[in-house]
Amino acid sequence: MIPVQGLRGATVAVLGLGRTGMSAARALRAGGALPLCWDDNPDARARAQQEGFTCTQLSRVADFDDIACLIVSPGIPHLYPAPNPVVRLALQAGVPVDNDIGLFFRSFATNAWANFDTAPRVVAVTGSNGKSTTSALIHHILEHVGRPATLAGNIGRGVLDIDPPHDGEVVVLELSSYQTDLARSLTPDVAVFTNLSEDHLDRHGGMGGYFAAKRRLFAEGGPDRAIVGVDEDEGLFLAGQLAEGRADDRVIRISFAQKLTGPGWQVFARKGFLSEYRKGKQIASVDLRSVPGLPGVHNHQNACAAYAVCRSLGLAPKVIEAALHSFQGLPHRSQLVGQKDGVRFVNDSKATNADAAAKALAAFPSIRWICGGLEKDGGMDALRNASASVVKAYVIGREAAAFAMKLPVEAEICTTMAQAVEKAAREAEAGDVVLLAPAAASFDQYDNFEQRGDDFMQEVAKYL
């Protein structure tokens, strides 16, 4: 655990007592603060009280008179579509609102670092798609070369649950827009922006607010090194804003769609090969086609981002290349479940928006596509030019009929995962891929995308 610094003796309100909220409450108490907790769920309050925390509902502005700050869990709205009532009261009372990420950055560095040979560093990864794979890949490469590393944030452990860093350790954080939007302190040493597509728009008031939330990771003077995907206008703009000039190699531009040129530092993937250029000269080339854990061009972008981070941390190209080949990938992300009679079954349940699904569809030549669920803001436009490889779609979800009508391919309404897998497997021919890439949220039928992916794998197991 990382004890929270700078709040000893202060009363700190904690709103939301799930994994993140309880982690913050424990870290606050370990640092000498006095957590005052609340959750609308009585079971969550009971669990907190069993750990000795005081639970009190804050229902008036006057209730905040003696409170130093309010810590909010990421699932609780603080602005859009409307602030949670407790958040609104805190703002009216002039009480700062923060989250566990802000507490982490204010508490990460300690006096113990004076005895370290190499100061610990923080790598933070954000973006719409590819955050988890990029973060896990960075962590894997560092572990492969024997460098101490910890994976936390939106993946792995909570940021305040990790141990205080060791000499030379690298902490890799995956950060969502919910986390970057609210954190009062964001000071990573290396920051990564993978890409941007329409997602979570209700929580950010539109694309402008969504991009602004991601961009906050690069504020406060900026990180020592910024790795920025430039295949969308927002990334191109961000890289231009951060760089002092064309040759400023504090910004590493990455792409999986174009060859990058210029005197700066670039890493891009074309036709399955990753290339690194610096000051106009090629430094290295890596064949990504034979890396089993990174199928598809969308994963080549993740490889470019992870490669750029590790190069900025001083690792040699050949060392990084060797580590790429031992990466197994993540569950529910282009995950090969099995194969029978020449038909492959791939679980990409994490493809929860149209852009992510479009990238998954681009990875395979002949697809039996299982999709559907709760459609997200932003619509289905990204799928219009990505369906050439789809033989047929099998649509699940409570609103399967409406979802199917928006697809640019032949679609059959299946409603349940069991029906979809059974029909897709029965109709598939050798060379086909039965792909779960929902292009939608899971909450109409499942608790989360992991449960949806597990259901797919269980149904596939019956067929194999």
Swiss-Prot record:
It comes from the Bacteria. InterPro entries: Mur-like_cat_sf (IPR036565), Mur_ligase_C (IPR004101), Mur_ligase_C_dom_sf (IPR036615), Mur_ligase_cen (IPR013221), MurD (IPR005762). Keywords: ATP-binding, Cell cycle, Cell division, Cell shape, Cell wall biogenesis/degradation, Cytoplasm, Ligase, Nucleotide-binding, Peptidoglycan synthesis. Pathway: Cell wall biogenesis; peptidoglycan biosynthesis. One of its GO terms (molecular function) is ATP binding. ATP binds at G127, S128, N129, G130, K131, S132, T133. Its EC number is 6.3.2.9. GO terms for cellular component: cytoplasm. Its main location: cytoplasm. GO terms for biological process: cell division; cell wall organization; peptidoglycan biosynthetic process; regulation of cell shape. It catalyses: UDP-N-acetyl-alpha-D-muramoyl-L-alanine + D-glutamate + ATP = UDP-N-acetyl-alpha-D-muramoyl-L-alanyl-D-glutamate + ADP + phosphate + H(+). It is found in: Cytoplasm. Pfam families: Mur_ligase_C, Mur_ligase_M. Cell wall formation. Catalyzes the addition of glutamate to the nucleotide precursor UDP-N-acetylmuramoyl-L-alanine (UMA). HAMAP family: MurD (MF_00639). This is UDP-N-acetylmuramoylalanine--D-glutamate ligase. It comes from Roseobacter denitrificans (strain ATCC 33942 / OCh 114) (Erythrobacter sp. (strain OCh 114)).
